[in-house]
């Protein structure tokens, strides 16, 4: 089987992740393996964990952790989600399903690429406007 490389970042690192509004991801133009620190200077502050997974390996990702995955060859993987046991995590899950996905879907249909461009700009501005940048 093919090797899979995973980078994990704790939820505390969210302010430097260039999180795209109304989504569950960072900017898709970021290459976390070869970051462009001129374009995305906050990436230099990230402290992540790396894991190399081979056929049959399992990786547990705690709730709220960011992950970036690359494959060395053609492959597939399977993710399983557990129902949240903590009320705080349950409310986040419901907000994500009911609010975030709905707003994203409606706005993407209404505005198309303009919506994506708007959110990408906001992601960058939010990170770069931090006091310690």
Regions found by a protein language model. Name each.
Residues 3, 13, 66, 83-85:
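Short, glycine-/Ser/Thr-/acidic-enriched flexible segments
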Residues 54, 65-78:
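Ligand-binding loop in jelly-roll beta-barrel domains
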Residues 1-60:
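Double-stranded beta-helix
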């Amino acid at each position: 089987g093919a090797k899979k490389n995973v980078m994990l970042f704790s939820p505390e690192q969210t302010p430097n992740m260039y999180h795209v509004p109304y989504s569950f991801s960072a900017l898709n133009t970021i290459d976390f393996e070869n970051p462009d620190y001129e374009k995305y200077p906050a990436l230099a502050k990230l402290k992540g964990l790396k894991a190399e997974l081979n056929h049959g390996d399992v990786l547990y990702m705690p709730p709220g952790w960011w992950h970036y995955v690359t494959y060395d060859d053609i492959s597939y993987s399977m993710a399983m989600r557990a129902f949240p046991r903590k009320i705080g995590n349950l409310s986040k899950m419901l907000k994500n399903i009911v609010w975030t996905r709905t707003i994203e879907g409606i706005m993407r249909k209404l505005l198309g690429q303009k919506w994506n461009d708007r959110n990408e700009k906001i992601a960058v501005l939010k990170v770069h406007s931090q006091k310690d940048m």
